[in-house]
């Protein structure tokens, strides 16, 4: 079991990530006031002293602790560390992402130093607004005793008000953060309005990171010429395994408890190319060859990626996790060289052997460019410049087996020749994810649109596509798009891309599910509704002999052999009518044609 300490934005993200595993875990908060939906998580409420934590971990067979608590919950962090050492439990620290420390801000180590600085006779404060939370009220009372006007900004909940009163605050000294439901104004605008009303000469903040609104508060204060003093975040205990995002969290859990997630995540080709490029830069520019490099993902978090080195640069062996990806195990290489001309773009990215070339429009790079998508290009450039801001380099990405593997991908159909694409949006592959499959469908639909054809022909796979291509012999190959099981989503994409004509080619197994209103026909989502099939047969109408035979079928395709040939066209019309009922509303401004295909490739239409 996993024990999570949360109550924060990071705690909420931890829950979302762990819930995907479908396995139970414990989620502990001090106050129990966080509004969070738990399906497999088991909520715990209240402080957990060291001895209680030890007893709980032992009695519930805890094998991993995730510390996603507030960075300033120092007592809890050190309690977790002591329990971890005593029970030999690994701890993952879900840390926040912190911006670089702004030199325009006055940085202090703790409240004691803050009080000394605020009462310094050379630069004394007169009016101080603390945004450090309700727990800061008692700590800052010495300022009030010295005649300094204090205000405290706290959360708008009853427990915070009660605690504020207990610590000596009065109503005139309290102001509140916007309610979570207040979406009319940005946080910065609310900060500005508050600062202008109170006119403090100092705003006291904690280094709470991006999710704590640190930059918004400090930017607003500095823009008004207000002095900002920030308390540095406490140093975490040694031994914690630190992540700063949901992807890194999942991969760390997969590493420590491999059985928790039934399926493991992987890395996109874009992330692998980025890691290889960054490693090659370390070798060229610093004469260093680290075994892992820190890769910043598009969401801002950083994950470690293992790298290898060779004569021309560095490489990464692609790990696709449990995703059925033909690129799994490929070596993705990067070599770097100096541009020799500071007038060039800082980082020039090229495709080498095994990286495809774009030959058709519809991509985020022009025809003739290497098939390295926009997000991977940005990742490569941003990661290199994060470490080497003055670098002027040419980066060449190569995939030695890319040309061979490309034959087993969508690339030939998309007009990408000579190799595979370097792709990725999040940088991480979620195994068998619907999002990943829909993204590939969307790319195919965009290429189909860029072809200039008015019609897109969507089909379930290679078999049905072969038959519908025979039905539309004059159409180019790129307008034939596989939907897998996501019929509804694919039609919606066609509508969003303003296709005037859409043809849906469907075989009977999926058609009977679709006719019953199931727009996702995956066997995990739905099975054939035999009673509905029998109702459609009666609608034909078929006689009782056919009905009795149909009652015994296992697969829908058996119906082709049961229904008399003279009634097949009418049966097809009934099935298509019901499919059309559910699909047509998804294409309100286009014309939908549905083709029902039998096992021999005969095509029926209404």
Where are the language model's segments positioned?
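N-terminal beta-loop-helix "entrance" segment that forms/cooperates
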Residues: 26-48, 103-105, 161-167, 303-306
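A structural signal for small-residue-enriched, beta-sheet-centric alpha/beta enzyme cores
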Residues: 264-267, 414-420, 425-572, 581-582, ...
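A C-terminal functional module that forms or caps the active site or interfaces directly
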Residues: 165-173, 177-224, 229-233
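Glycine-rich, highly charged phosphate/nucleotide-binding loops
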Residues: 41-57, 176-190
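Anionic-ligand binding region
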Residues: 133-177, 188
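Generic N-terminal targeting/processing segments that precede catalytic cores or assembly contacts
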Residues: 260-408, 412
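Glycine/small-residue-rich loop that forms an oxyanion/phosphate-binding "nest" at active or ligand-binding sites
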Residues: 64-114
């Amino acid at each position: 079991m996993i024990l999570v300490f949360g109550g924060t934005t990071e705690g909420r993200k931890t829950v979302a990530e762990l819930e995907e595993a479908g396995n139970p875990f414990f989620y502990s908060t001090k106050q129990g006031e966080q509004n969070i939906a738990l399906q497999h998580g088991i909520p715990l409420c209240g402080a957990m002293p060291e001895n209680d934590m030890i007893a709980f971990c032992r009695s519930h067979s805890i094998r991993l602790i995730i510390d996603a608590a507030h960075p300033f919950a120092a007592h809890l962090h050190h309690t977790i560390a002591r329990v971890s050492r005593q029970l030999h439990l690994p701890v993952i620290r879900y840390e926040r992402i912190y911006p670089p420390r702004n030199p325009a801000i006055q940085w202090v180590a703790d409240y004691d130093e803050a009080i000394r600085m605020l009462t310094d006779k050379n630069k004394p404060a007169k009016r101080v607004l603390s945004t450090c939370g309700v727990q800061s009220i008692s700590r800052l009372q010495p300022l009030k005793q010295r005649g300094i006007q204090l205000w405290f900004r706290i959360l708008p909940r009853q427990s915070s008000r009660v605690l504020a009163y207990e610590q000596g605050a009065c109503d005139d000294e309290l102001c509140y953060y916007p309610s979570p439901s207040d979406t009319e104004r940005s946080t910065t605008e609310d900060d500005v309005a508050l600062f202008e009303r109170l006119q403090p000469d100092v705003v006291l903040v904690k280094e709470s990171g991006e999710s704590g609104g640190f930059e918004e508060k400090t930017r607003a204060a500095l823009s008004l010429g207000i002095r900002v003093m920030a308390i540095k975040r406490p140093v975490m205990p040694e031994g914690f395994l630190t992540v700063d995002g949901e992807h890194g969290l999942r991969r760390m859990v997969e590493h420590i408890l491999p059985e928790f997630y039934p399926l493991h995540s992987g890395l996109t080709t874009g992330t692998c190319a980025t890691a290889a490029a960054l490693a090659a830069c370390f070798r060229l520019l610093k004469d260093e060859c680290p075994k892992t490099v820190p890769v910043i993902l598009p969401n801002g978090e950083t994950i470690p990626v293992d790298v290898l080195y060779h004569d021309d640069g560095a490489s990464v062996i692609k790990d696709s996790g449990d995703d059925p990806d033909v690129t799994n195990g490929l070596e993705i290489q990067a070599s770097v060289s100096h541009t020799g001309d500071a007038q060039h773009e800082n980082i020039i990215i090229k495709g080498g052997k095994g990286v495809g070339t774009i030959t058709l429009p519809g991509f985020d790079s022009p025809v003739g460019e290497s098939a390295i998508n926009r997000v991977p290009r940005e990742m490569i450039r941003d990661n290199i410049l994060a470490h080497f801001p003055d670098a002027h380099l040419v980066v060449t990405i190569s995939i030695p087996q890319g040309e061979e593997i490309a034959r087993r991908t969508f690339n030939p159909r998309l007009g990408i020749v000579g190799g595979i694409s370097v792709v990725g949006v999040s940088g991480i592959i979620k195994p068998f994810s619907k999002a990943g499959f829909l993204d590939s469908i969307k790319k195919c639909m965009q290429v189909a649109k860029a072809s200039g054809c008015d019609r897109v022909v969507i089909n379930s796979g290679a078999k049905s596509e072969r038959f519908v291509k025979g039905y539309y012999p004059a159409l180019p190959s790129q307008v034939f798009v596989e939907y897998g099981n996501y019929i509804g989503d694919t039609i919606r994409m066609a509508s969003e891309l303003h296709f005037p004509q859409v043809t849906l080619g469907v075989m009977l197994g999926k058609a009977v599910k679709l006719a019953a209103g199931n727009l996702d026909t995956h066997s995990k989502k739905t099975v054939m509704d035999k009673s509905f099939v029998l109702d459609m047969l009666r609608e034909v109408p078929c006689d009782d002999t056919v009905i009795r035979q149909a009652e015994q079928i296992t697969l829908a395709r058996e119906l082709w052999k049961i229904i008399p040939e003279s009634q097949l066209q009418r049966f097809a019309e009934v099935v298509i009518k019901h499919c059309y009922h559910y699909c047509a509303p998804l294409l309100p401004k286009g014309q939908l044609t549905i083709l029902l295909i039998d096992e021999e490739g005969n095509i029926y239409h209404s």
